[in-house]
A protein has these predicted regions:
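Outer membrane beta-barrel transmembrane domains
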Residues: 69-78, 228-365
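Residues that define the transmembrane beta-barrel architecture of outer-membrane proteins
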Residues: 52, 88-92, 133-139, 156, ...
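Short loop/turn motifs that connect adjacent beta-strands in outer-membrane beta-barrel proteins
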Residues: 25-28, 44-53, 65-67, 103, ...
């Protein structure tokens, strides 16, 4: 029981690390900004709930998106015809957490992204070429507080967090495109390194101990991006006249919800935790604050999320593999407007991954 009582502060260590380019996996562009993977795994040395300490976390995330969906319907013909878009995205996430006492903590994190996007339609439609982007992403700074004193509360706890996402990532990353003649221009929104907006992060994390080994967890996350568009040209207006409203990149909100359970095998100086749950993440059609003009691919992914964590003294290893069970590319604002104008339902498509691979390590300094 004591082990789980102290578990609550360790959750704060992991809240902002192990992406997420969280994340909806593919052209629904949730970047690796870290906040989309909240920790549900314990660390053996869990005194961070009650003392001043520092934690360093490093994580890695990879996925390949290639399955196209329009709404919830998969466009299987894209792979048969060989005109699907294929994204390979890797994110290395580094961050540091300062625990002030059993209530308060603050985390600063910065991802590094490596992206490749292979397509036909962006390169004239006859030959497949690739575009690239790599560099630092958007920084986040979040302050968290547990609502109840961990010294007195043993059954469970709730943590609330508030912070900012800073536009440190390049939102106008460029690569060479091959049409009539090669030209350098901005890469697709899904592999841009940042979105150009200053985001407002709000999150709620909680856990409940059912027994000394079995517990449940939940995480709710929303990032509001008040900025409307960021000025990065998409060139979508060159595809069809009906996409004229999408010539500029939108700065969209992002959301995440998780619910699951943990079971811990406790050793003398170590602990192995097995976790399982569901994960919902995506981009809304309309932002919570401000306008929602420009180009975005709204949608969501519902995933089954198995996880493992191994704790040994002052170090914790973790890994999870969210597996998509439902993918939905919802109607964008432009789709809705064109549906009204034409009298027929218009909806774009987006490429999604089958799963993502996430793993990392945390150290108490």
């Amino acid at each position: 029981m004591k082990f789980f009582t102290k578990l609550l502060a360790v959750i704060a260590v992991y809240i902002l690390f192990n992406n997420s380019n969280v994340n909806a996996q593919g052209c629904v562009a949730i970047r690796g900004n870290g906040s989309f993977q909240t920790m549900d795994h314990p660390m053996l040395d869990t005194t961070i709930a009650s003392d001043k300490s520092w934690y360093l976390t490093a994580s890695y995330r990879y996925f390949k998106s290639f399955r196209h969906f329009s709404g919830t319907a998969e466009q299987k013909q894209r792979q048969v015809l060989g005109n699907e878009v294929i994204n390979h995205q890797s994110t290395i996430d580094l961050g540091i957490t300062r625990n002030f006492d059993q209530f308060w903590s603050a985390t600063v994190g910065l991802p590094y992204l490596i992206n490749t996007r292979s397509s036909l339609y962006e390169h004239g439609g006859k030959e497949r070429h690739s575009s690239y982007s790599h560099g630092i992403g958007d920084m986040r700074i979040v302050v968290n507080r547990w609502l109840f004193d961990s010294h007195k509360t043993h059954k469970g706890n709730i943590q609330v967090g508030l912070g900012m996402k800073l536009p440190t990532g390049n939102f106008n990353a460029q690569s060479t495109f091959y049409n009539v003649t090669p030209a350098v221009r901005p890469v697709d929104q899904s592999i841009q390194l940042g979105d150009g907006g200053t985001g407002i992060i709000a999150e709620v994390n909680g856990f409940l101990n059912f027994t000394s080994k079995f517990s449940g967890y939940t995480n709710l996350y929303y990032m509001a991006n008040p900025r409307n568009v960021n000025g990065t040209r998409t060139y979508r207006e060159t595809l069809r006249a009906t996409l004229a409203n999408e010539a500029n990149s939108s700065v969209p909100d992002q959301f995440l919800a998780r619910l699951g359970a943990n079971y811990t095998f406790q050793g003398h100086n170590s602990a192995l935790t097995v976790s399982g749950g569901m994960r919902l993440e995506g981009i809304p059609v309309y932002d919570l604050i401000g306008k929602s003009d420009g180009f975005r691919r709204p949608g969501y992914v519902l995933s089954a999320e198995p996880s493992l964590s191994y704790s040994l003294r002052k170090i914790n290893f973790f890994a999870n593999v969210p597996i998509a069970v439902k993918r939905d590319r919802t109607q964008s604002k432009t789709d809705k407007e064109n549906s009204i104008a034409t009298g027929t339902r218009v909806i774009g498509d987006a490429a999604f991954a089958d799963y993502s691979i996430n793993f990392g390590v945390s150290f108490k300094l």
